[in-house]
Amino acid sequence: LAKKPALAFAYHMPRRNSPEYYAMGLLDQILAEGDDALLRQELVKRKGYTDSLNAGINMLGNMFDYQGPMLWTVSLFHDSNIAADQIMQASDAVIDQVRTKPVDQATLQRAMVKLRSDLYDNIEQFSGFGRADLLCSFALFDDDPARINHLEEQFARITPEMIQKTAEQYLRPENRTVLVVETKAQAPEQKSGN
């Protein structure tokens, strides 16, 4: 059984390589990656619901090395005196900000810098294995290993309005799955039956 309660929520991703897919990559940076990320600011710094959160597209790799359906996932551990519903309400309030109005240009530029840094970290990881992983993924899934040379261009095409439209379409509650993990003390008593 869990020693500490946890919460995860995930949204279905847009089709790979679509403009919305690249917008979701930037939304991941805006909402969850780095100390300036909106969810991190709200859940960790302002509310103190958790000391950290994990998030990303394709939790078993990166946003480029998969083919097929995928999720953008956020997960965190929290204290037992904080209800999962409280955390979801705070998360929804933050996500609604990007769903209802475009992000400003400074936020988009910070997201691009973080994304570029993340991309080059992926490429250089494990003494170049990251580059091989991306080349293989683009060759296998897209028949286009040269796609690695054009990733930044794809992200640079994304506007604040595209980010809002993508958030509105994909980051809605009906497109989400929520997982709540409770400790034994929190779980309702189960009766055994015949």
Task: Locate each region found by the language model.
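M16 family metallopeptidases and their MPP-like homologs
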Residues: 3-15, 41-156, 177-182, 189-193
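Active/ligand-binding-proximal structured segments within catalytic/core domains
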Residues: 9, 19-31
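Short beta-alpha junctions and helix-cap segments that line functional grooves
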Residues: 26, 151, 165-167
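Generic alpha-helical structural context detector
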Residues: 28-32, 41-44, 168
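Bilobed periplasmic-binding protein-like "clamshell/Venus-flytrap" ligand-binding domains
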Residues: 164-182
